[in-house]
Amino acid sequence: MPQPKVKLVVTGDDFGYCERRNQGIVDCFRAGGISNVSLLVNAVSAKHAADLAKRYHMPIGLHANLSEGLPVSQELKGSTLLNKDGFFHGKMGFREVLHSGQLKMSEVEAELRAQVNRFFELIGHMPYHMDGHQHVHVLPDVREVFAQVLSDFGITYTRVPIEPGLRFCNFLPSHLREFNAQVEKDALESVEVFHRNGIRWPDVYLGLSTMGKNMCLSNLKRALEASLDDGVSSPLILTQSNNAASNCYRPVTAELMVHPGYPSQPQQGGCGEGPDDFSQSTDRLHELNTLRDPMVLNFYRQQGIHLCAFKDF
């Protein structure tokens, strides 16, 4: 078999969110559309997801959640991580509280450690990789605590959400372009922190420009071709190697973040406060159908793109 040009990890995020999402992720995995999953251990259907992962031998990591729903740690009552109702502050609320200087990093650390331990209880082994729900793991101050937790537990892979060519994706609405630009800035500033703690990541990250209705064969082609063009010249790749020349003779490694599934029903799913609009959208089904489309799978084969998982690294 010829050497692949790209070793692509296609990660289905938010495993555990609800049973319909879980089933959609499993169906996508069994059809060859994804090769890896990321578990929300504080989600209401996390146990259901864990049982499915073991049944179907799904490579699985931890999608650490500090922004949605209820905490795992039982010692966070009155915590700066939580609002007056006892829930996390939300995607933007978490960032606002962090930037105001009100978050205690000791509480962030306690919750991250509790989630790793819950993952082990559910799955029976440590996560093959660990990232952050809504990209919280690359935020200032959080990144240092996150990296230390991974180092302490021996978790060696994470996600660095910097997507080649993203700045040219003018089809994205302005609010998403603004959010994505900040995510990339935070991610770039996390590189040295992760590197210093012995944490690795794929050479290329994809997924910010291909979410929901923006996922289609032409858009996946564009994103993957941008990753190939980026190749070994990427500063993220060179950061991870003391011998950059050797990278010329190995495949590019990449992660594609995806969110397939069957849409959540009202009042079903979530992380303790019900499902959000994102989970109830038909965009989930659109991603599922696109990822398992024979045209997409054939494109991978034609381009020398081999689907794999973090554990294969």
Swiss-Prot record:
Keywords: Carbohydrate metabolism, Hydrolase, Magnesium, Metal-binding. Mg(2+) binds at D14, H133. The active site is at D13 (proton acceptor). It holds the Pfam family YdjC. InterPro entries: Glyco_hydro/deAcase_b/a-brl, YdjC-like. Belongs to the YdjC deacetylase family. This is Carbohydrate deacetylase. The gene is ydjc.
